[in-house]
């Protein structure tokens, strides 16, 4: 036929059997990729330190999605929460990966069958004897089935009625585990951070889908609407399907980037807004203040801060710090976190406590400035020493560590004080191993950043695809340059399928 690459899909335009075949093959490719990617990630994943080297630091992409749906154990004997397991059962990480690969193989065979046996009686209209699809009826069937799946997921899987539940955590990502979730039917169900909304929304949306599916199966569209929306044309289906997909892609890009109950920080890493707003820093200070109020010493109060909480309060875990095109995991950037050095508290020679101004998200470099409790600049690391008034040496700044590996250690040497002041710009200070992976010291984004960028990009692309195919199907007669009511048509553009011998033609 000699079709150009951008027009090859016309071969399945009037061929329902092979249209099904290529869609089944597409499903085979998607499921096969998911299963294969899961096996690859399991081969390279190190589960030994879920606190300082979690899945999102290692660049895992499909493991977090399995985990949020209730998979926590591996046939390798480890659990994502850090313990060991003896009998993970079929629904382990490897079991899910294997199920996807088996399903992919079955879809591959089904696609071949449908490609070979394309001319089935089910595709033939009894009234005309020609191949055609009852698209409104098919729409009703798909709506009904997707409604059943949606309702079933919310009713059984999420609630734990028949299933594991989903990953649920506290607001600071410290106590996450898989558990059953009760539907939230009140106004709290609309809070994107309330897990109960996931159950209730799936139940409600599934119910609506079932009812809408039954409606479309039992009620035929009015003739005017059928013709106006070109419901008999398969390209209408393509256009509206693309619309559904790009809308969903925009929504999940938002829930991933801004955070929600569906994207827990323990699985995907913190959001950039948690750094921007000092979210974890405030919680750490609240806990320390509570400890001091209970007559604990500063050292005791800081020592009770969970290492996991301190690690979230580090700019290297901010997904907006990694460039969009810097390949590799976070561990390949600043290195593998080994331990928390502790919280540095700086003081000048007059005994005032000084706070290092933290680096904003979109800065690569930032001046080292130390302010007192009132926000007044008291010390800095000057660019020009000749003009300096607030240098560490002049002000006599010292640093002492509380909690962590350097608990109780203090430094007054200006070079060391400046070193830790620079590191304090980046949040809590951690020892990072850059040798093991030959990490280059340049920040990388987390899977949260990749997912958002990918889905926002494809959503934009699919938006234009929706406009393109929607315009093509609505204005097909205009683009072809022919009155659709003409009895004969001979011009190239109006043929639905190139080389179709059934297209009526006559020599003019």
UniProtKB/Swiss-Prot annotation:
Molecular functions (GO terms): chlorophyll binding; electron transporter, transferring electrons within the cyclic electron transport pathway of photosynthesis activity
The alphabetical list of record keywords is: Chlorophyll, Chloroplast, Chromophore, Membrane, Photosynthesis, Photosystem II, Plastid, Thylakoid, Transmembrane, Transmembrane helix
Give the principal location in a single coarse category.
Answer: plastid
Task: Identify its membrane topology class.
Answer: Multi-pass membrane protein
> Which parts of the chain span the membrane according to its record?
21-36, 101-115, 140-156, 203-218, 237-252, 457-472
Give the top-rank taxon of the lineage listed in the UniProt record for this protein: Eukaryota
Q: Which GO terms describe its biological process?
A: photosynthetic electron transport in photosystem II
Concerning Pfam families, the annotation shows: PSII (PF00421)
One Gene Ontology CC term in the entry: chloroplast thylakoid membrane
What is the annotated localization of this protein?
Plastid, Chloroplast thylakoid membrane
InterPro entries to which the protein is assigned, alphabetical: PS_antenna-like (IPR000932), PS_II_antenna-like_sf (IPR036001), PSII_PsbB (IPR017486)
Cofactor note text: Binds multiple chlorophylls. PSII binds additional chlorophylls, carotenoids and specific lipids.
What the entry lists under SUPFAM superfamilies is as follows: Photosystem II antenna protein-like (SSF161077)
What does it do? One of the components of the core complex of photosystem II (PSII). It binds chlorophyll and helps catalyze the primary light-induced photochemical processes of PSII. PSII is a light-driven water:plastoquinone oxidoreductase, using light energy to abstract electrons from H(2)O, generating O(2) and a proton gradient subsequently used for ATP formation.
UniProt subunit comment:
PSII is composed of 1 copy each of membrane proteins PsbA, PsbB, PsbC, PsbD, PsbE, PsbF, PsbH, PsbI, PsbJ, PsbK, PsbL, PsbM, PsbT, PsbX, PsbY, PsbZ, Psb30/Ycf12, at least 3 peripheral proteins of the oxygen-evolving complex and a large number of cofactors. It forms dimeric complexes.
Q: Which family does it belong to?
A: Belongs to the PsbB/PsbC family. PsbB subfamily.
Q: Which NCBIfam families match?
A: PS_II_CP47 (TIGR03039)
The protein depicted here goes by the name Photosystem II CP47 reaction center protein
